Amino acid sequence: ENVDFENDTSLGYPASKLDDKVFYSDAPFLKDAPTLKTYVANPNHIGCHTFGSSESAFKGTQEIEREVLRVLAVDFFKMEDEQFDGYIAPGGTEANIQAIWVFRNYFNHHFDAKNNEIAILASDDTHYSIPKASNLLSLDLLHAPVDFKTREIDPKALENLVQKAVSNGKKYFIVIANMATTMFGSVDDPDVYTDLLEGMGLDYKLHIDGAYGGFVYPFSNLKSKINFSNPKVSSITIDAHKMLQAPYGTGVYLCRKGLIENVLTKEAEYVEGMDLTLCGSRSGANAIAVYMILFTYGPYGWYEKISVLLMRTNWFCKQLDQLSIPYFRNEHMNIVTLYSSHICLLYTSDAADDRPRV
């Protein structure tokens, strides 16, 4: 249903088909390669296709993106159908920044909060995209200490951190809870944050960074409540270019209805509909890739893949146990982090020149 910019007559669209002197749209192999064919067609998925209208020239691939978001929001993360907004972002870093941007503006608009009254609250193991968001959005970032062995947030240290922040004028908190940190695969308990903040009578919004664990944890821990069935969870991000093995960069931002409009850019007047995203123009080919992967596997096929990964991880951990090599691993994740004291430096590369350390 997309406009064919190679053969159709069209004017006035924010679109650009790939140069046909370099990228051949009639190459025979494209018939059996939907993602590559879409890549050449280059649909512009500018805007948010779960909220209001969008550029009508790309309604076909926009519908595929909406279906991908529905599968992730409803089937993966237990959201009620039609009660979510979101988009396929150029990566998890942008998706996390988008989440914090939405919450900052929510507090600005609904509480008349000043930026110096808002703080980001996250663990020491949180991804570096969060300090980026702190810098870009002019918000202070508070690092909650974690236990060295368990990687769990220290409740007492967290309480002291929040009390000090309140005494320094902080009134509103943007909480980032990790669904598998990049370095450890550790999973935060969101209740550690929310119980404390509610007990202190503080306003907050809770975001789940599932960039790594989003395609693993819902299938490896079927009893998990780190999803939209928990009314305290307002948004979730996932990276499809990690465990789903979609092309770089393919992140996903999901949130509850009533939030994303806080970042409406009214100045984007030439765009049909409303631009509620950080990136603006983005390729629709990523949506096709994610759709193909999800529907090729299906829920049972994906569950099987994750189960095999966990079996291999369990096997690897047993070998480490036999060798008395200490490590950290969340039982529901496929990341194993070894203690540096038990790694032979001879076989690790030096960060400076990539040569083996001696």
Region locations from a protein language model:
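N-terminal entrance/gating region of PLP-dependent enzymes' catalytic architecture
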Residues: E1-Q83
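Catalytic cores of large soluble enzymes that bind and process phosphate-bearing ligands
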Residues: S53-I64, G91, A122, T150-I153, ...
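Buried hydrophobic packing segments
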Residues: E65-L72, A95-R104, I130, V290-L294
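Active-site C-terminal subdomain of aminotransferase-like
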Residues: F219-L222, I226-L323, F328-N330
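Single conserved hydrophobic/aromatic residue that forms the stacking wall/gate
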Residues: Y347-V358
